[in-house]
Amino acid sequence: MIVLGSWATSNIISGTIGYYRSDNSSKYFHQMNTAWNLVNLGIAGFGYNGASEIDLSLGYEAALDKMQSFDKLLLINSGLDLLYIGSGAWLWDQGIDTSSERLTGYGKSIVLQGSFLLLFDISLYLIHRRHAKNLGERSTQLTFTGNGFLLSF
């Protein structure tokens, strides 16, 4: 969430400055970047807070269930990111067709933000899957030690 929070903060700062220093579609591009990343910053804050409250008492099955749920969430988010990119491209095109600086600027911004989020979500998914493989390689073993049985995970 530090990556998302850093992206959001840099976009809020540059978007605010860019809004006041730009004209035409660039002004609207920066306006949308600022607004979009206020939401991203909130999401990053909740995510960072949630990550600090990890329940270390979870058993193997519960941890695996949580990981699978998170994987599904990342894949759903990736689908939404593609919708953002497509919607942004449509707005951008409509802005060009109608000579609307606002639609052009907003469209460019949404394409950029959706592309970043797609890269972010896919990267997080791939990292998460690599960690899940390590968890999945652990298997339950029951061995006889001579004095009793040893159950290892």
Language model features by range: what are they?
Residues 1-18:
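Start-of-domain marker
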Residues 2, 22-41, 68-75:
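Transmembrane alpha-helix entry/boundary detector in multi-pass membrane proteins
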Residues 13-18, 38-53:
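Canonical alpha-helical transmembrane segments
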Residues 16-22, 93-97:
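Juxtamembrane "helix-exit" motif on the non-cytosolic side of transmembrane helices
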Residues 33-36, 80, 84:
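Mid-membrane cores of alpha-helical transmembrane segments in multi-pass membrane proteins
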